[in-house]
Amino acid sequence: MPKLEVCCYSAECAIEAEQAGADRIELCCAPKEGGLTPSFGTLRAVRDRVALPVHPIIRPRGGDFCYSAAEFEVMLNDVAQVRDMGFPGLVIGLLDADGHVSLARMRRIMHLAGTMDVTFHRAFDMCLNPYQALRQLTDLGVARILSSGQQQSAEAGLALLRELTELSRGPIIMAGACVRLTNLHKFVQSGIQELHSSAGQFFPSGMRYRKAGVSMSADSEADEFSRYRVDSEMVANMKHALTVLPVATRPA
C-alpha cells in the first residue's frame, strides 16, 4: 500500500497528523517559504511526543538551493543536531550554480547523516537534468526523491514521475506538490509508492485585536492573522483512500 507523508509546520500539526493516520512526517517551519529548518524547541517537542518516523527538513533559507559556504556550514550543524537527537531521517537538497546536484557537498551530508534515511527534496525539480540527477542520487545512496516531476504540481508532472519510478534502481520516487484526495488515484495507478501532502489549510488566528497599519513582514499586504495547520479529517480521508485504491505493479 502506498505511504502517506504529511508535511507539518509545527509540533501541534505533527501530533494531529499522527493521530489522523499519517505514515511519516516531514517537519518544517515557515510554510510561506516552502519549508525551512524547524527550531530546536520544535524538534524536541516532536521527538518527545510523536512516535511516527519524523524527518526534519534541513533548509536554512527560502529561495534557490545554491548555498554559500557559511550557509552550508549551518546545514552541516543542523544535520548533526537532528542526527544526535535520534531522528531516523532528514530532508535536504543542494544544487550548484549550473543546476546540477552538488555532489561534493551531498557526499559530506551523506557521510554526516550516517545511517539516517535521506530524502532529496524538490531541489530535484529545479535541476537541469533529472535523469542525470537520479543516477547521481542513486550512487550517493539517497533513500528517496521528493518531486513534482519538474512541474508546478505533481499531477502536471505525472508523466516524468512515472518514468523516474520505472527507471529508479534505488531511491523511491515520492510525488509531492498539490497532492490531494481528489487526485490520489492518478498517482497510485501510475505505480507511485509514496505520496507527500501538506494536507492542511490556513485558519484564522485567535487574535481578536488586530492592529491596523503595522506589519511584521516586508510584505505589508501579507495576512499575518492566519495560521497554517494540518487538517486531520483530510489526512484520515487520504489515508483511507490509499487503503482501498488498487495499486499498480512496479515494473521489474
From Swiss-Prot:
Its main location: cytoplasm. Belongs to the CutC family. NCBIfam families: PRK11572.1. This is PF03932 family protein CutC. The keyword Cytoplasm applies. It is found in: Cytoplasm. The lineage of its organism: Bacteria, Pseudomonadati, Pseudomonadota, Gammaproteobacteria, Enterobacterales. GO terms for cellular component: cytoplasm. Pfam families: CutC (PF03932).
